[in-house]
């Protein structure tokens, strides 16, 4: 994905991991991009440097996705560097600890809801006023195929992502035709977080899908580029899930 497909677009991508791949794909296609991070400034700076290699303007900003004051400061900074925006990718999220429902603490439940649900709410609430009134805006919410498939011992995570899906549908009705809102729901994707945090046995089990492999971050970034581009202007309220057939298992 290179060229000028997104030339002139100003995009905001929250969170890292898949968000890094999305941000770099946007930059390759000519977009100016701002990314957010919580703690790893060095990694964010590396991503900015990678994006700048494509001759675009790139920025990073520290923002805790579930913190309202942080999000207000993010909006102020975006207004300062971009003026207005065209694309928001709500990617920041947390998976949570694997545990049966009887062992999920209230604090852990609240933590996941704060990041995965409230984070989408806050970014959308405070960044909507920044969308360019003369262009069709795009909001892309990153969910998970587990939001429809379910997963034992991850009720907090699947519930949070199910809420994101519902928010997408309501926002699509509320904001169209000026801003188009869609969900991208990845299946099992090979990310640094997965490879570092999960056992090799878990990773191998995740490959037990019709395509027989984990997806790549490129499989996800390609869809987000489509939705962010001029070719995504008849998508509204959609649930798009690159998952290698995982939903059938």
Residue ranges and their predicted role:
Residues 144:
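Residue(s) in the substrate-gating loop at a strand-loop-helix junction
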Residues 124, 160, 168:
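Active-site helix of classical SDR
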Residues 95-98, 149, 207, 225, ...:
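Short C-terminal tail/terminal secondary-structure segment
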Residues 129, 172-177, 233:
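Alpha-helical segment proximal to the catalytic Tyr-Lys
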Residues 99-101, 105-110, 139, 194, ...:
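Substrate-binding pocket helix/loop in short-chain dehydrogenase/reductase
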Residues 3-34:
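Canonical Rossmann dinucleotide-binding motif of NAD(H)/NADP(H)-dependent dehydrogenases/reductases
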Residues 156, 186-209, 219:
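A glycine/serine/threonine-rich, flexible loop-to-helix segment
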């Amino acid at each position: 994905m290179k060229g000028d497909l997104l030339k002139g677009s100003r995009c905001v991508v929250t969170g890292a991991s898949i968000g890094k791949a999305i941000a770099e794909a946007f930059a390759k296609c000519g977009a100016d991009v701002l990314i957010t991070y919580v703690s790893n400034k060095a990694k964010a700076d590396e991503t900015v440097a990678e994006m700048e290699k494509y001759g675009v303007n790139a920025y990073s900003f520290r923002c805790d996705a579930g913190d309202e004051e942080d999000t207000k400061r993010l909006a102020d900074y975006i207004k300062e560097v971009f003026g207005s925006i065209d694309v928001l990718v709500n990617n920041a999220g947390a998976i949570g600890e694997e545990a049966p429902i009887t062992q999920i603490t209230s604090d852990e439940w609240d933590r996941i809801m704060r990041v995965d649900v409230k984070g989408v709410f806050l970014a959308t609430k405070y960044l909507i006023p920044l969308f360019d009134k003369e262009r069709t805006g795009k909001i892309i919410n990153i969910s998970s195929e587990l939001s429809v498939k379910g997963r034992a011992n991850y009720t907090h995570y699947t519930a949070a992502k199910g809420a994101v899906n519902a928010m997408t549908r309501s926002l699509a009705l509320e904001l169209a035709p000026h801003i188009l809102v869609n969900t991208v729901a990845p299946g099992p994707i090979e990310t640094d977080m997965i490879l570092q945090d999960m056992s090799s046995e878990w990773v191998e089990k995740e490959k037990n899908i019709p395509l027989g492999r984990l997806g790549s971050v490129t499989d996800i970034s390609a869809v987000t580029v489509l939705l962010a581009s001029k070719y995504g202007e008849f998508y509204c309220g959609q649930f798009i899930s690159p998952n290698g057939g995982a939903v059938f298992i």
